[in-house]
Design a protein with these regions (language model features):
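Helix-to-loop junction immediately C-terminal to a conserved catalytic motif
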Residues: 71
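Conserved ABC transporter NBD signature motif
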Residues: 79-90, 94-95
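Conserved ABC ATPase "signature" region
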Residues: 119, 123-146
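Conserved ABC ATPase signature
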Residues: 150-157
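Catalytic Walker B motif of ABC-type/P-loop ATPase nucleotide-binding domains
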Residues: 175-179
Length: 268
């Protein structure tokens, strides 16, 4: 199970207010090598509380590797990651207590019911009010009537919702999503967008990796575009739109993505 790691709103999230100006996620010089292959090359960026950053790039750009490094699942070769001020390498327990990572493939315990998954997660994170919070999450994600079912009795989308309910149970301040809408129907997609926006408004720093660029355009305040493991663009959506509008290009995120990755050079 991936969530315990130690785990209709169409308006984009706005920039964080001044009182939340410190970084929820701070990354400096992040590099990941696999022998001679550079999967991620010298990434530096920050995501503040209340911000939602879209992480996009072609297949093989390094998106999932970046997320796995940020979540502490794999160690970077070089560079540092801080989660709400906690150094991920030096203080991994405290750092991971503040985050939730949702992989693209939900992994659950075969012989635990939906509610037992929440109870298990609550014990890991010592969530005292887990009954109240868990019930609210199941209602929000529309699986409250599935609480007695085993994973084998759930659809792909319901499994994804259960993983998300477990990951949000301890109210993480930093949230990483890797393709969060896989397996969801249109109503589930709308609910998930609402949930992402709600967490950001409550002060979480959020990163979403997705190929669904129209989703990112609806919920993200910032975008980081990668190619060949390198940063191509990191800016607010408004700044990116302005830059490409001045260059005579279209200003929706899909057109910006194709233009930016076509113009970007590979690593030297």
């Amino acid at each position: 199970m991936d969530v315990p790691i130690a785990p209709d709103s169409s308006a984009s999230v706005q920039r964080s207010p001044p009182e939340l100006a410190h970084a929820g996620i701070e990354v400096s010089g992040l590099t990941k090598l696999y022998k001679e292959f550079t999967a991620v090359n010298n990434l530096s960026f920050a995501v503040r509380p209340g911000e939602v950053m879209g992480l996009v790039g072609p297949n093989g750009a390094g998106k999932t590797t970046t997320l796995r490094c940020l979540a502490g699942i794999i160690p970077p070769t070089r560079g540092t990651v801080q989660i709400v001020g906690h150094h991920l390498a030096a203080d991994p327990v405290k750092a991971k207590q503040e985050l939730a990572f949702f992989p693209d493939e939900p992994r659950l315990f075969e012989y635990l019911t939906v509610w037992q998954h929440l109870e298990f997660t609550a014990r890991i994170y010592q969530v005292e009010r887990y009954r109240e919070i868990g019930a609210q999450l199941l209602e929000e994600l529309e699986i409250a009537d599935k609480r007695a079912l085993l994973p084998g009795e759930l659809s792909r989308g319901m499994k994804q919702k259960l993983v998300i309910a477990c990951g949000l149970l301890h109210s993480p301040k930093v949230i990483f999503f890797d393709e969060p809408l896989t397996g969801l129907d249109p109503l589930g997609i709308r609910r998930m967008k609402d949930s992402i926006v709600r967490r950001a408004k409550e002060g979480a720093a959020v990163i979403i990796s997705s190929h669904l660029l129209h989703l990112l355009e609806e919920v993200c305040s910032h975008v980081l575009i990668l190619k060949n493991g390198q940063k191509v663009i990191h800016a607010t959506l408004d700044e990116v739109r302005q830059k490409f509008s001045e260059a005579g290009a279209g200003t929706n995120l899909e057109e910006i993505f194709f233009r930016a990755t076509a113009d970007a050079k590979g690593p030297s």
